[in-house]
Design a protein with these regions (language model features):
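Alpha-helical segment proximal to the catalytic Tyr-Lys
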Residues: 130, 174-178, 238
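C-terminal substrate-recognition "lid" of short-chain dehydrogenase/reductases
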Residues: 122-125, 133, 137, 218-247, ...
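A glycine/serine/threonine-rich, flexible loop-to-helix segment
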Residues: 178, 185-214, 224
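Active-site helix of classical SDR
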Residues: 125, 161, 169
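Canonical Rossmann dinucleotide-binding motif of NAD(H)/NADP(H)-dependent dehydrogenases/reductases
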Residues: 2-34
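Short C-terminal tail/terminal secondary-structure segment
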Residues: 94, 98-99, 150, 212, ...
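Substrate-binding pocket helix/loop in short-chain dehydrogenase/reductase
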Residues: 70, 98-111, 206, 210
Length: 254
């Protein structure tokens, strides 16, 4: 039997990049998936429906930084699937971000990164958690970053936002644990996704050095993250919460 049969998942940022792979992997393990993204996920939803059935997937276009839209997304998911068992807080600004010295980062850009990368996960948890509390179970997987463990110069907006995600995980794991809800962070290393490869500056600056820092000397791909994602979403991780799981080829020994 599929490990997530009968469960319902929301994947924010689930229409493209690494998030697309998360959506596909959850569906392949039997979960019903709501693909939620600021980009249109209907084509991916159709692809998943062909493989796993029309009742297994839905998509919604939304802005994770907008509370009203987060609330509506949760309501749509409940209307379509009846419950929410898994929340993957994946939506984030990364690929389009410029590298800037901290003295050159505009406040508007800084606030926009924080709005998407940390306010977004907060808003989703705020509106999903009551339903998980009511059913006395749930898995919240916040997507962090290996950059938090070592810092990256000229990228403080992103690194700071992901550091906040780690702190958020630790705080709410204490708050929600008594309700049977597990909250963990999955922290990828520098991953070659289709969207990531579109930013030539990031690739040029990061790819070779990322491989050099690893114990396992090769590129990281979205597929490398899926085993850990499914583990955190499944009953196999029922006694694990508040943790950061680094999937980075041994870059950071956490």
């Amino acid at each position: 039997m599929a490990r997530l049969s009968g469960r319902v998942a929301i994947v924010t940022g689930g229409a493209k990049g690494i998030g697309q792979h998360y959506s596909q992997a959850l569906a392949a393990e039997g979960a019903c998936v709501m693909i939620a993204d600021i980009a249109d996920g209907s084509a991916l939803a159709t692809e998943i429906a062909v493989k796993h059935g029309t009742n297994s997937v839905a998509s919604a276009v939304f802005d994770v930084s907008d509370e009203a839209q987060c609330k509506t997304l949760v309501e749509k998911t409940l209307t379509r699937f009846g419950k929410i068992d898994i929340l993957v807080n994946n939506a984030a600004l990364y690929v389009p971000l410029p590298t800037l010295k901290v003295t050159d980062i505009d406040v508007v850009l800084w606030d926009h990164v924080m709005a998407v990368n940390i306010r977004g996960p907060f808003l989703m948890v705020k509106h999903v958690a009551p339903h998980m509390i009511a059913q006395k179970s749930g898995k919240i997987i916040n997507i962090g970053s290996g950059t938090v463990a070592r810092g990256i110069p000229e990228f403080s907006h992103y690194v700071t936002s992901k550091g906040a995600v780690t702190a958020f995980t630790r705080a709410i794991s204490r708050e929600l644990g008594e309700h049977g809800i597990c909250v963990n962070t999955l922290a990828p290393g520098y991953t070659l996704s289709d969207t990531g490869l579109t930013n030539a500056v990031h690739v040029e600056k990061s790819r070779a050095s990322a491989v050099q820092r690893r114990a396992i000397k090769r590129d990281e791909y979205p597929e490398d993250l899926l085993g850990t994602l499914i583990f955190l979403a499944s009953s196999d991780s029922d006694f694990m919460t508040g943790q950061v799981l680094a999937v980075d080829g041994g870059t950071n020994n956490t």
